[in-house]
């Protein structure tokens, strides 16, 4: 490969290398992507473009291909630059060309220094040439060496950029990886620049150059040109001037150049011109850059060049040419006023069903939209289009015709120049106004070639922007100029619609008014070569998460893959979804592609910009979205908080911490049954526990109301935790918010900014909207508001905006523009505008924003509202930041608000408000009480000062403390100093003290000689005392010692004679057993045990004056005198007798002789020998069961016990006379067989011979047309038909239709024909006659006893009437008695005869003992008056009305059948109520027979008390029996407990096996209770008090049986206590809560559960007959069994009461606390639909819909494997989950409820089982307490016995 040929400039001079550097740098960025390396590391073009770049001469590509040497030195000359005449001239400026040349070395040579050319040329304005000094030669670019990867043992290189097992040139491996993804820049990038691609440095702001080695100069602002300029250009006046060459009118004559031309430098190479004459506009030098077309060639930017003014950027542009333009600089878009855009929309909608979503797209009509002045709008289709004739580079965005909005890193008309350094203040932005469109629109941009242009060269590219609904996508077919219409009259935009084939036609063609611009004449158009348009990005559905492996939470609009995965999306797809690829943590460029981190998107080839997620619909539900850098925040209004999902606002009342009482019962005006602890309102009302809350008894809101959703946003059973929710009312911090990218514009230097003129568009609603607005810097929500045309996220410099001017004539040079006029005050703007246009009406009401628009003849004026000011753009009002003026005057912190401000005063100041003005005023602290006590207060600014009084000192601000003068030693030198407030006092010293340094010190009297003779002197504070020697005592004044007469004390020589001496005494003549000690002061005891032979077989213990024998050996005891040990006859001691054997005494011990069947254990107890172990005494005909001292055989079926029960023999079943009737009996071992005769067969149930019914088994063929009659053992055939049939002529037997006679059943019934017979079905009130052939009336008055009570009964046909004796009374069918007319409650309408009365009222039932009030205790809830008063109740109703006496008339009316009988609801006989026995055990549940078992009888009930209890008829419960009154608890202390007792023994005694006696640990016991010393049968099941299913293989004790699997024990079938009782808890030493849990699983009310095992524990009634809701508290009680059996047998008219039936699936649907379940009175419907139970026609319950997302499910409906065992399946919004029972926790990995090991949980609230051992169980745990402790519940623990 050879270097491209270069051409020298023939006679042209390049003036300034700075003006050519930036355009060529841009060409470098584009050209490098299409180039390849040469062997020395340089880039050469690749592919078919290589030949073009090697062309000699004036191709514009040559400048691009030769730009690389500029990086060596920017002032180096460049060879082969194009001739100056081929460069596109700017408007009114001389043509410029590059000044430097670069030369590339040959391929095989090392780079060498470039030699400068012999001569360079500089261009003059007149076109002459002059010589210029030579430029410096640039140093050679160093050769790029191939970077070798580190020699690490990581294996072979993988991934991209790998060439031949090594990293490709320019790449190296990243740290700790084997991937070649790290680019290499040599030499490295300077000034902290980053190497983004090989040999490509991305510079930080403020730096530039190939290696970021150059600092960008600071800029100055030229107020006349409004363009940035380098601060270093100090030459020339501030007004940068350059001559302009203009063309007058439409002729080709050239105006002479202006005099006094001065050269000026601009930062970006743009030459700017301002003429003092009539030349108006900004001139711009055209730069070359590669267009993003497929050809890869560099094309012009299609700048308008034609004559006349051209409106660009809102300002008139005049172009003047000094010569005809060449073909390379043609104006390709000149006079393009009307554009035709042909596109086809595709509407895509999402359809979701059963958790699956699918996109359905429908292609719309092909629409042709004619856009004039760059804008077009289809008001019917909802599409808005504007196009750009120029492409915007580096991520720029087209916002109008020939107008680019550039990102922060670029500037210039096409965003092709690097941005200046960001060290200046950004321009202030106006607020963005959301366009009043019909709905949110989405913008799509397409870069397409413009067809039908005026020049036959490379087509110009335009950007077409289409705003359309989000669910639509658009395909552009053609963008073309409308030919032949340039000379026509002013045109209007129009829309043409062409229906697509096979689809219904879309909206028809429509027209709309737009801005009319006069058309101008132009050159004839020439067709361009065809170019394939670019395909828009594919749109799909964006999903936020997945659920059960499927994509979920889709966004409502279709998005592109990059927009979805780069912002909030996790999955994306069109027909199916795929996960989004991972994003890097920071921007990374790999293989030329820029990878942006999450929350950012590509701005250009090297920069990423923040994604405004708040533009995405559906992110923050019921909250406000705030965009942040790389993410977003959901904020709530004051009073609302974000929930844990951070996407939903809930009321702060949902997490209120205010606590109060929760009431479980709400009556008329009263609250009752409060909970013991105070809880919050949401826990009380959201958990269904409470009905009212708080000190004011606030009623809990009803579900579905707004008040309920306010405190329970998640519904019933769920509350929010305050620790999971944080207040979100703060504003996002400045560093969190996403700042829009911005171009730092120049400072304004006091001049007014020129507002951008925007062409108004007419929206579909007919209102006027702005085509574009400039964002305001102070608007915090600028990044969240979209305009009606496009969404912009960048700032533009103020100088880049033009100034609105009046219209100009079509031909000729425009006059000098008028400057904008500003009038006082500053918030009023007068803007010139074309006459005749009402700007205030055109801008609707928001043209000025928060202000008033005043129309003027030449414009309009904005009068801003208070708190607002005129925006620097002079176009509207914006918020006035009053804080900039320091309205708080430094006394507080100013916080600006929209239209106002707030002062937060510092300490020492207070807020003073006067209208809209706020200020901080000083607080006079001296006026406040308690300030500067004991001092003088002086107020200061923001504070105060205290001056203390004399005698006080300041210790802290505002507090004067007394000075303690006594601290100074010289205050009182001869006395005691006493301090006083503000002063002090000197006092004289007391006796024993002397003055010293202001205080009194003690005098040491012990220093005086002769003090305390016969003792020691002890100095005291102010005195002294004497401590005397032994034998002396202190005198009364304690200042001397005297002798003690020891003999006067009785304790001296108690066993001898005492003699007193001075200071001592002596003893003599001691008693027996004592002797005088050595010093003679005492008679000491004589130790007899020191002599040998004392106390044989024992231990000698010395005593005072004697001795004794103690601790005799085993079998011995001390004698009567205690001097010897004698043998003990243990057989005479009842406590030492052999238990179950005979005792024999021995020397020092005894022996036990056991009877047969027993064996000696522990030497003292005869234990039973288990003969069944190891021996098969009863096998194989029975099972051996051990007994006390023997055994017996439990024989199998067919065997009987023999030999005294020790063996089993066969039973001869054939000995029974009636065995095997119709056959012969054959006895077998353990059974028998029947050999049946012909016509008989063995019965599969009993084995007996039963007759074979041949007529039934063989059917009709057996007798043919004859009738078959069965007989024992045979059958016979009889000629004729069965009764009820007649023989047809064909010989067949046909049924006789007796019902053909209409009168066969009379007039009160109808006939029902049956096969061979008929029956009469009678009307209500009639019954079948004895003959069965007709219906007769039923006399209810005779049949039903006292059916009308005390009223008269009158029988009528088919019914009966109850008549009252007095006309002033009427019969109340509901109460069953006569009542005065109009008295007592609401009138009851008269029921028709035979109608069922409404259901009775159900209320509370009370009972009381004889010596207490009748309403002392609550017996039951939800009972009728008859159920209460006819059974055990003494009071009924809310007011506890007393039940009538049994001998009263009222009692007969309520209970006509007597005590114990109640009416059956829904069961009627002949129009009368049916009465049956009341099951008190079911009706009152735990209210009866507490601590026992309730057994229903007819009538009444009986109580079977648990062991340790006796029945108390007065209280109707089993009360504890005090065993301590009956038994002595021998040798110990008896303590009674509930249902039992305990014996406590004192050491060395211990409790024996009977637990009732304290015995010596070495002795035995006797007379133990049978159930403790005996091992007996353990029965596993008890059915109707009959024991079955014995525990095979072993016998157990009573405790072992009942505490494990047994329900009864011993051959007497002794029942075990219920597992939910206290007796069971004490017997088995477990806590009460454990006993309740073992009794069965009790469910939470209000839910639907999965099916459970069909056993006793899962039924609606517990093992002790108590309904399961008993464990849920009285508030959850249900009125009656909800599954009553009323079906009975077919012939029963009065169904007998049966236990509640267990449904096939455990579905507690009708619990009282179930959502929507109401206790309805009188059959009313309360709040929802009343549903009748199929088994009870009169029983109603109210049912309403579950709250969505929180209902329970049955197993077959649950979407979880195994249906949540140990829990319940609950459907939530995301699918299914398990609500585990207590003691289980959810394992989310397996979606199962697993047991919680409470014993291993060291993080629990308290240590478990203190004073005991913790044993984990399935779903719970139990505590095994140590001796001396008993188990307690809540939480389970062990407490000491009382």
UniProtKB/Swiss-Prot annotation:
Stretches for region C-terminal domain: 1631-1842
Modified residues (Phosphoserine): 494
Keyword Secreted carried by entry: yes
Highest taxon of the lineage: Eukaryota
Ranges of biased composition (kind: Low complexity): 107-120, 132-144
Assigned keywords, A-Z: Disulfide bond, EGF-like domain, Extracellular matrix, Glycoprotein, Growth factor binding, Heparin-binding, Hydroxylation, Phosphoprotein, Repeat, Secreted, Signal
Tagged with keyword Cell membrane: no
Any one GO MF annotation of this record: calcium ion binding
Domain (EGF-like): residue spans on this chain: 181-213, 384-416, 610-650, 836-878, 879-921, 922-961, 962-1001, 1002-1042, 1043-1084, 1085-1126, 1127-1167, 1168-1209, 1210-1250, 1251-1294, 1295-1336, 1337-1379, 1477-1519, 1520-1559, 1754-1794, 1795-1839
Organism, as annotated: Bos taurus
Major localisation: secreted
Descriptive protein name: Latent-transforming growth factor beta-binding protein 2
């Amino acid at each position: 490969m050879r270097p491209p040929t270069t051409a020298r400039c023939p006679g042209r001079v390049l003036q300034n290398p700075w003006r050519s550097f930036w355009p060529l740098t841009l060409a470098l960025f584009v050209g490098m992507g299409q180039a390849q390396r040469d062997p020395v590391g340089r880039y050469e073009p690749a592919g078919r473009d290589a030949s073009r770049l090697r062309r000699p001469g004036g191709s514009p590509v040559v400048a691009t291909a030769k730009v690389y040497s500029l990086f060596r030195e920017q002032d180096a000359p460049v060879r082969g630059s194009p001739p100056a005449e081929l460069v596109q001239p700017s408007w009114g400026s001389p043509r410029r060309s590059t000044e430097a040349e670069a030369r590339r070395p040959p391929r095989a040579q090392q780079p060498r220094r470039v030699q400068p050319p012999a001569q360079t040329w500089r261009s003059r304005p007149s076109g002459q040439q002059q010589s210029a000094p030579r430029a410096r030669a640039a140093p050679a670019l160093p050769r790029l060496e191939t970077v070798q990867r580190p020699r690490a043992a990581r294996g072979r290189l993988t991934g991209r950029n790998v060439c031949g097992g090594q990293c490709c040139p320019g790449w190296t491996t990243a740290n700790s990886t084997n991937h070649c993804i790290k680019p290499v820049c040599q030499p490295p990038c300077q000034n902290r620049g980053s190497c983004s691609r090989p040999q490509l440095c991305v510079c930080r702001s403020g730096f530039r150059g190939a290696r970021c080695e150059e600092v960008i100069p600071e800029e100055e602002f030229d107020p006349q040109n409004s363009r940035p300029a380098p601060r270093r250009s100090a030459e020339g006046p501030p007004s940068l001037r350059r001559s302009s060459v203009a063309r007058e009118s439409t002729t080709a004559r050239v105006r002479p150049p202006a005099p006094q031309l001065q050269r000026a430098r601009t930062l970006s190479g743009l030459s700017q011109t301002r003429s003092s004459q009539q030349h108006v506009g900004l001139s711009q030098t055209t730069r070359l850059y590669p267009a993003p077309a497929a050809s890869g060639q560099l094309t012009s930017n299609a700048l308008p060049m034609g004559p006349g003014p051209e409106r660009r950027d809102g300002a008139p542009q005049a172009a003047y040419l000094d010569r005809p333009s060449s073909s390379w600089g043609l104006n390709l878009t000149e006079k393009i006023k009307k554009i035709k855009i042909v596109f086809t929309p595709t509407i895509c909608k999402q359809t979701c069903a059963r958790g699956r979503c699918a996109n359905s797209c429908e292609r719309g009509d092909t629409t042709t939209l004619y856009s004039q002045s760059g804008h077009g709008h289809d008001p019917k289709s909802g599409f808005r289009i504007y196009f750009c004739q120029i492409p915007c580079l580096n991520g720029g965005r087209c916002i109008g015709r020939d107008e680019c909005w550039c990102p922060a890193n670029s500037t210039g008309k096409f965003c092709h120049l690097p941005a200046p350094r960001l060290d200046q203040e950004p321009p202030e932005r106006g607020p963005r106004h959301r366009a009043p469109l019909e709905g949110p629109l989405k913008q799509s941009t397409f870069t397409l070639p413009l067809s039908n242009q005026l020049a036959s060269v490379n087509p110009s590219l335009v950007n077409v922007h289409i705003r359309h609904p989000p669910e639509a996508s658009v395909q552009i077919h053609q963008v073309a100029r409308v030919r032949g219409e340039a000379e026509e009259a002013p045109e209007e935009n129009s829309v043409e619609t062409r229906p697509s084939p096979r689809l219904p036609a879309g909206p028809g063609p429509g027209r709309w008014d737009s801005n009319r611009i006069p058309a101008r004449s132009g050159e004839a158009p020439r067709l361009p070569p065809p170019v394939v348009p670019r395909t828009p990005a594919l749109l799909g559905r964006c999903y936020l998460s997945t659920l059960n492996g499927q994509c979920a939470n889709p966004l409502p609009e279709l998005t592109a893959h990059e927009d979805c995965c780069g912002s909030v999306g996790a999955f994306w797809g069109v027909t199916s979804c795929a996960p989004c690829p991972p994003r890097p943590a920071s921007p990374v460029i790999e293989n030329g592609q820029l990878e942006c981190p999450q929350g950012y998107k590509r701005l250009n080839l090297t920069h990423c910009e923040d994604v405004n997620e708040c533009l995405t619909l559906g992110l923050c539900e019921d909250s406000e979205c705030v965009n942040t850098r790389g993410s977003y925040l959901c904020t709530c209004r004051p009073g609302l908080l974000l929930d844990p999902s951070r996407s939903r606002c809930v009321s702060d009342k949902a997490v209120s911490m205010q606590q109060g009482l929760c009431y479980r019962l709400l009556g008329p005006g009263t609250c009752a049954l409060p909970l013991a602890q105070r809880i919050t309102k949401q826990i009380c009302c959201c958990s269904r526990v409470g009905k009212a809350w708080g000190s004011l008894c606030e009623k809990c809101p009803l579900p579905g109301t707004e008040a309920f959703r306010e405190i329970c946003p998640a519904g019933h059973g769920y509350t929010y935790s305050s620790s999971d929710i944080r207040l979100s009312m703060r504003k996002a911090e400045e560093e969190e918010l996403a700042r829009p990218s911005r171009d730092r514009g120049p400072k304004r230097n006091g001049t007014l900014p020129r507002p951008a003129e925007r062409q108004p568009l007419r929206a579909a609603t007919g209102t006027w909207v702005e085509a574009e607005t400039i964002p305001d810097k102070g608007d915090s929500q600028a990044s969240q508001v979209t305009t009606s045309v496009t969404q912009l996220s960048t700032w533009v410099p103020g100088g880049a905006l033009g100034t609105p001017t009046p219209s100009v004539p079509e031909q000729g040079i425009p006059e000098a523009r008028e400057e904008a006029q500003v009038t006082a005050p500053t918030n009023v703007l007068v803007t010139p505008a074309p006459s005749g246009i009402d700007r205030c009406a055109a801008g609707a009401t928001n043209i000025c924003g928060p202000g008033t628009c005043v129309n003027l003849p030449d414009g309009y004026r904005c009068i801003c509202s208070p708190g607002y000011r005129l925006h620097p753009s002079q176009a509207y009002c914006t918020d006035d930041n009053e804080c900039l003026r320091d309205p708080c005057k430094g006394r507080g912190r100013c916080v600006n608000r929209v239209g106002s401000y707030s002062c937060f005063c510092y300490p020492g100041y207070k807020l003073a408000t006067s209208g809209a003005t706020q200020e901080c005023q000083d607080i006079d602290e001296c006026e406040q009480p308690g300030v500067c006590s004991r001092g003088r207060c002086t107020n200061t600014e923001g504070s105060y000062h205290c001056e203390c009084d004399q005698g006080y000192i300041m210790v802290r601000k505002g507090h004067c403390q007394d000075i303690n003068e006594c601290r100074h030693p010289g205050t009182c030198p001869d006395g005691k100093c006493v301090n006083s407030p503000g002063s002090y006092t000197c006092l004289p010293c007391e006796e024993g003290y002397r003055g010293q340094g202001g205080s009194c010190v003690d005098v040491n009297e012990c220093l005086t000689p002769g003090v305390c003779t016969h003792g020691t002197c002890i100095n005291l504070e102010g005195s002294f005392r004497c401590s005397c020697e032994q034998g002396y005592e202190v005198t009364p004044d304690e200042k001397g010692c005297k002798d003690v007469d020891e003999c006067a004390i009785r304790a001296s020589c108690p066993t001898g004679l005492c003699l007193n001496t001075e200071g001592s005494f002596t003893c003599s003549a001691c008693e027996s057993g004592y002797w005088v000690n050595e010093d003679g002061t005492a008679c000491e005891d004589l130790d007899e045990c020191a002599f040998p032979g004392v106390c044989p077989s024992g231990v000698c213990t010395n005593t005072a004056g004697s001795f004794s024998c103690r601790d005799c050996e085993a079998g011995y005891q001390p004698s009567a005198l205690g001097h010897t040990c004698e043998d003990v006859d243990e057989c005479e001691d009842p406590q030492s007798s052999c238990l179950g054997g005979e005792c024999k005494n021995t020397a020092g011990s005894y022996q036990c002789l056991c009877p047969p069947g027993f064996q000696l254990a522990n030497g003292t107890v005869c234990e039973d020998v288990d003969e069944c172990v190891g021996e098969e005494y009863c096998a194989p005909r029975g099972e051996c069961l051990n007994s006390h001292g023997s055994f017996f055989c439990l024989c199998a079926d067919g065997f009987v016990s023999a030999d005294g029960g020790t063996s089993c023999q066969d039973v001869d079943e054939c000995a029974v006379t009636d065995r095997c009737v119709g056959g012969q009996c054959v006895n077998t071992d353990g059974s028998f067989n029947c050999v049946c005769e012909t016509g008989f067969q063995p019965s599969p149930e009993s084995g007996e011979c039963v007759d074979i019914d041949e007529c039934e088994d063989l059917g009709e063929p057996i007798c043919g047309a004859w009738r078959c009659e069965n007989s024992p053992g045979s059958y016979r055939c009889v000629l004729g038909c069965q009764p009820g049939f007649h023989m047809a002529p064909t010989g067949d037997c046909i049924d006789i239709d007796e019902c053909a006679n209409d009168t066969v059943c009379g007039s009160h019934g109808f006939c029902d024909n049956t096969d061979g017979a008929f029956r009469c079905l009678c009307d209500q009130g009639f019954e079948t006659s004895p003959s069965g052939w007709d219906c007769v009336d039923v006399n209810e008055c005779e049949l039903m006893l006292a059916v009308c009570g005390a009223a008269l009964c009158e029988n009528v046909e088919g019914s009966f009437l109850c008549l009252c004796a007095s006309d002033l009374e009427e019969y109340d069918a509901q109460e069953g008695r006569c009542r005065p007319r109009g008295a007592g409650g609401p009138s009851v309408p008269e029921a028709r005869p035979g109608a069922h009365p409404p259901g009775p009222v159900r209320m509370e039932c009370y009972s009381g003992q004889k010596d207490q009030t009748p309403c002392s205790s609550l017996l039951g809830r939800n009972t009728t008056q008859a159920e209460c008063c006819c059974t055990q109740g003494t009071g009924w109703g809310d007011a506890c009305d007393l039940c009538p006496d049994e001998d009263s008339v009222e009692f007969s009316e309520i209970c006509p059948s007597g005590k114990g009988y109640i009416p059956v609801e829904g069961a009627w006989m002949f129009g009368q109520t049916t009465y049956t026995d009341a099951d008190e055990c079911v009706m009152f549940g735990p209210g009866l027979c507490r601590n026992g078992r309730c057994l229903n009888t007819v009538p009444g009930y009986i109580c079977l008390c648990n062991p340790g209890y006796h029945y108390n008829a007065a209280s109707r419960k089993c009360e504890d029996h005090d065993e301590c009154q009956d038994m002595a608890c021998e040798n110990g202390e008896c303590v009674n407990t509930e249902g039992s007792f305990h014996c406590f023994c004192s050491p060395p005694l211990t409790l024996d096996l009977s637990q009732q006696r304290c015995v010596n640990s070495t002795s035995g016991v006797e007379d133990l209770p049978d159930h403790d010393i005996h091992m007996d049968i353990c029965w596993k099941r008890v059915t109707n008090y009959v024991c079955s299913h014995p525990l095979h293989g072993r016998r157990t004790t009573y405790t072992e049986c009942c505490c494990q699997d047994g329900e009864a024990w011993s051959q007497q079938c002794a029942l075990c206590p219920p597992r939910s009782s206290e007796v069971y808890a004490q017997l088995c030493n477990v806590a009460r809560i454990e006993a309740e849990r073992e009794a069965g699983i009790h469910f939470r009310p209000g839910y639907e559960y999965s099916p459970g095992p069909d056993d006793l524990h899962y039924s609606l009634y517990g093992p002790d007959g108590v309904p399961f809701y008993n464990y849920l508290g009285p508030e959850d009680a249900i009125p009656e069994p909800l599954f009553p059996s009323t079906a009975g047998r077919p012939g029963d008219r009065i169904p007998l009461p049966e236990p509640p039936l267990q449904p096939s699936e455990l579905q507690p649907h009708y619990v009282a606390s179930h959502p929507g379940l109401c206790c309805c009175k009188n059959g009313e419907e309360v709040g929802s639909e009343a549903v009748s139970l199929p088994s009870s026609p009169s029983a109603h319950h109210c049912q309403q819909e579950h709250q969505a997302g929180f209902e329970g499910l049955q197993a077959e409906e649950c979407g979880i494997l195994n249906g949540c065992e140990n829990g319940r399946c609950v459907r939530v919004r995301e699918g299914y989950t398990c609500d585990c029972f207590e003691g289980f926790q959810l394992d989310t990995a397996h979606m199962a409820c697993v047991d919680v090991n409470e014993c291993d949980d060291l993080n629990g609230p308290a240590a478990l089982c203190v004073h005991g051992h913790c044993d984990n169980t399935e779903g719970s745990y139990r505590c095994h307490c140590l001796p001396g402790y008993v188990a307690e519940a809540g939480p389970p623990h062990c407490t000491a016995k009382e």
